[in-house]
Amino acid sequence: MDFKRVKDYLSWLYYQYQIISCCAVLEPWEQSMFNTIILTIFAMVVYTAYVFIPIHIRLAWEFFSKMCGYHSTISN
């Protein structure tokens, strides 16, 4: 894939984002505030998923393994 096609594709994605989120009709300072809020929410969701999903997967694994009768020698 050449650089121009990638650049055009990313520009198209950004345009789609602006149209879907109605950012195209906002003033520049409103766009920056909106994008900052969206980026902050996205970062918080990613961080929360990174921190808490492995814990929940481990707890679910322990629950179902005990329920099915499999006892691991690794867990205490």
Swiss-Prot record:
Q: Which InterPro entries match?
A: Ser_palmitoyltrfase_ssu-like (IPR024512)
Q: Where in the cell is it found?
A: Endoplasmic reticulum membrane
Give the main location.
endoplasmic reticulum
Membrane topology term reads: Multi-pass membrane protein
Alphabetically ordered keywords of this record: Endoplasmic reticulum, Lipid metabolism, Membrane, Sphingolipid metabolism, Transmembrane, Transmembrane helix
Q: What's any GO biological process attached to this entry? A: sphingolipid biosynthetic process
**Which parts of the chain does the record assign to the membrane side Lumenal?**
30-36
Task: List cellular component terms (GO).
Answer: endoplasmic reticulum membrane; serine palmitoyltransferase complex
**Domain of life, source organism:** Eukaryota
Which Pfam families does the record cross-reference, listed alphabetically?
Answer: SPT_ssu-like
| Parts of the chain on the Cytoplasmic side | 1-11, 58-76
Pathway given in the UniProt record: Lipid metabolism; sphingolipid metabolism
Q: Which residues cross the membrane?
A: 12-29, 37-57
- Give an example GO molecular function: serine C-palmitoyltransferase activity
| Family stated for the protein in its record | Belongs to the SPTSS family. SPTSSB subfamily.
Assembly and interactions? Component of the serine palmitoyltransferase (SPT) complex, which is composed of SPTLC1, SPTLC2 or SPTLC3 and SPTSSA or SPTSSB. The heterodimer consisting of SPTLC1 and SPTLC2/SPTLC3 forms the catalytic core of the enzyme, while SPTSSA or SPTSSB subunits determine substrate specificity. SPT also interacts with ORMDL proteins, especially ORMDL3, which negatively regulate SPT activity in the presence of ceramides.
Chain's role: Component of the serine palmitoyltransferase multisubunit enzyme (SPT) that catalyzes the initial and rate-limiting step in sphingolipid biosynthesis by condensing L-serine and activated acyl-CoA (most commonly palmitoyl-CoA) to form long-chain bases. The SPT complex is composed of SPTLC1, SPTLC2 or SPTLC3 and SPTSSA or SPTSSB. Within this complex, the heterodimer consisting of SPTLC1 and SPTLC2/SPTLC3 forms the catalytic core. Within the SPT complex, SPTSSB stimulates the catalytic activity and plays a role in substrate specificity.
- Entry protein name: Serine palmitoyltransferase small subunit B
Source organism per entry reads: Bos taurus
Source organism lineage? Eukaryota, Metazoa, Chordata, Craniata, Vertebrata
